[in-house]
Amino acid sequence: MVCPNGYDPGGRHLLLFIIILAAWEAGRGQLHYSVPEEAKHGNFVGRIAQDLGLELAELVPRLFRAVCKFRGDLLEVNLQNGILFVNSRIDREELCGRSAECSIHLEVIVERPLQVFHVDVEVKDINDNPPVFPATQRNLFIAESRPLDSRFPLEGASDADIGENALLTYRLSPNEYFFLDVPTSNQQVKPLGLVLRKLLDREETPELHLLLTATDGGKPELTGTVQLLITVLDNNDNAPVFDRTLYTVKLPENVSIGTLVIHPNASDLDEGLNGDIIYSFSSDVSPDIKSKFHMDPLSGAITVIGHMDFEESRAHKIPVEAVDKGFPPLAGHCTVLVEVVDVNDNAPQLTLTSLSLPIPEDAQPGTVITLISVFDRDFGVNGQVTCSLTPRVPFKLVSTFKNYYSLVLDSALDRESVSAYELVVTARDGGSPSLWATASVSVEVADVNDNAPAFAQPEYTVFVKENNPPGCHIFTVSAGDADAQKNALVSYSLVELRVGERALSSYVSVHAESGKVYALQPLDHEELELLQFQVSARDAGVPPLGSNVTLQVFVLDENDNAPALLAPRVGGTGGAVRELVPRSVGAGHVVAKVRAVDADSGYNAWLSYELQPVAAGASIPFRVGLYTGEISTTRALDETDAPRHRLLVLVKDHGEPSLTATATVLVSLVESGQAPKASSRASLGIAGPETELVDVNVYLIIAICAVSSLLVLTLLLYTALRCSAPSSEGACSLVKPTLVCSSAVGSWSFSQQRRQRVCSGEGPPKTDLMAFSPSLPQGPSSTDNPRQPNPDWRYSASLRAGMHSSVHLEEAGILRAGPGGPDQQWPTVSSATPEPEAGEVSPPVGAGVNSNSWTFKYGPGNPKQSGPGELPDKFIIPGSPAIISIRQEPTNSQIDKSDFITFGKKEETKKKKKKKKGNKTQEKKEKGNSTTDNSDQ
């Protein structure tokens, strides 16, 4: 017989020999025997040799032996007869404790050939242990004031046997005050207790002696008893009461020392000392409980003071009592059940297998990215592992098999929003506390070309000065692409188009990489004011994506054009203009008018006129209008003035720096009786039939002027009568004006009937204004094709400024400044136009416009301007504001060609007479000259 407790020097060799022979030697078997505990030495167990099929004669030669893992002296085999018998006393409670099953395992080994047999000998329990109470006597102190059905817990008996042998029943000795409350089978945790069924009276029965008997279920029955000494207390009639009779707590087996287990709470309805509670374990608590737990007497807190071992004890039942300080003291009882929980000491393990990394951003949902396997060496709940993913979006974990997961794409990706994800896979077991392990997964998102280059704004406005050097950098376009690498590599190009007769690429170019826009040639504001084109941005992706941006390049004007004089048809030698002026003219008489044009625009084309001083500081009786260019007398001429004057007129613009031009006017003073045969008074730049005036008979002019004066007086009288009549419309009324043009060579008129609202202001007239229509008399195509003016006719900036001080009707416009030049337009509001849509823009300061002026108006339904070389439908010769007198004609009346509109100018009719009153012919001649001067103005 060989047992592990004995020392066998050849055991290692034997074990090695057994392992080698086990590969080819068979012959294994298993036998079951049973033996009651407490069997005496030599008690028969079984015929082991016969049951194993071995001959008695071969037991010794084959080295028959039985090996046990525990005590080797309990069983023995007789090699002579092959019988297994009891060798020493077997105590089941000592061998297996309170385990439900108890057996002795033997390994029977025979050699030649090697055979191993397993034999299990079951040790059956017998009722050899009586019930035992913790103490032979239990003292109980019960107040006489305790109510009926009060329960007093008792510590039950314990039986070392198992099964029916440990099933206990209790009985109490007969009495009239108490009965025994025995918990049912499903209330094993609930302690045994005495229940009061009759009120106690200390004066009648101060003490009670009862006997509690416990009987097991064995055969024969065994019993145990305890003496119950009950002392009846007086006065303190309220015992402490716990919140619960049973507290259940779970503690892990590796709980640290000093950990609070529970804080049971008891309350006492008494006051003073009778309500002060002291906590303690019950007097009959086991020493094992006292070695592991401690209870604070004042707070009742139970803490851990010893090591907890799940394998040693899975639960601890702690009886607790709360005793007040009354006399006699009262006690409340409860039970604390501490369940020891096994510790989860193995964390899960994760294994990752990457399949498709990096993942393209256009991958479809459901694409598998990584395979994950988990493993936990624990068992039960502690080995059940679940996986989770953080962050979840846009991925998810899919369980494919037990402990196997797939990391798949859950929603669409966008590399431009998130280019990479750092995912954490957490594997957590079901233990308490749970253990976990984590693994990081780096998911990189590969870029695809899904974003076109984008500009910051759809269009840009660029201002470039004209006359820039070739290759000048004018702007830089920049487009951003949210993609990466070559998908974000942006190149720029022009969207080719035609600019007039030339290609766009002849004006500008764009650098393909930097997006810088260059002007390939000097830009000319007079030729090109606005250059609008598109720049395209394309990335290098496959397929390439792109977008366009619009550039509006405004060419800013510079003062690069000097004023140009408009040459007259009849002039003096050397480019000078000759003018003949009678000595009889008074102050303010217009001698000539210098006309010039500037190809620039804005202030660069706004012209002013200055009269250069003569040498030696001599004064001359002439001046020039600052913005009109009109040369007029500053005083009345007399005999002391030089007969000839050379006037130098400086024309300059308002640019920076200012550019100038010079005009020479030769003025000759003649006597009043001499005819100005070669006068060019019409001013520089005026062309037309006025030059034919030189050859007209002076007497014919005097006759025409006389007839015209009579007609004017008639019209003024008629108009005054008409205006004095009451009007239903007040100051503004609808009339039919008949507009007639009168010139120095006669009257040429074209009646144009139109219903208009004319508003006349109040106040005395200050000067003459004559309105006329440039239309010809009624004739073939005269209505549609008005007479063309001299192509040299242009309005300069000064003339345009002067026109702002004139009264202009609805169809008034401004002529273009010159060929290729910009339109100098100052929109204003006309008092003859009631539309509120008309814009209001003031002309430049100093342009000759005051707050009382009637100015041009552009608005819906009003033509802006006539084309180059055309006269406007109606215009006003510049002058100061005056009261307009308009003749009204019946609807069907015939309009005579001699009908015209004129404005009275009393100062011309009241000239100082230098001749005798009887010389009427000379007076008429002067009136004719005055009329001619007015027409020039």
Curated annotation (Swiss-Prot):
GO terms for molecular function: calcium ion binding; identical protein binding. Keywords: Calcium, Cell adhesion, Cell membrane, Disulfide bond, Glycoprotein, Membrane, Metal-binding, Repeat, Signal, Transmembrane, Transmembrane helix. One of its GO terms (biological process) is cell adhesion. SUPFAM superfamilies: Cadherin-like. Residues 775-787 have a biased composition (Polar residues). Residues 719-937 are cytoplasmic. Cadherin 1 to cadherin 4 domains mediate homophilic trans-interaction, the interaction with an identical protocadherin expressed by a neighboring cell. This is a head-to-tail interaction, the cadherin 1 domain interacting with the cadherin 4 domain and the cadherin 2 domain interacting the cadherin 3 domain of the other protocadherin. The cadherin 6 domain mediates promiscuous interactions with protocadherins on the same cell membrane. Each cadherin domain binds three calcium ions. Disulfide bonds join C96-C102. It comes from the Eukaryota. It is a single-pass type I membrane protein. This is Protocadherin alpha-7. Residues 896-910 have a biased composition (Basic and acidic residues). Residues 1-29 form the signal peptide. Calcium-dependent cell-adhesion protein involved in cells self-recognition and non-self discrimination. Thereby, it is involved in the establishment and maintenance of specific neuronal connections in the brain. The lineage of its organism: Eukaryota, Metazoa, Chordata, Craniata, Vertebrata. GO terms for cellular component: plasma membrane. CDD domains: Cadherin_repeat. SMART domains: CA.
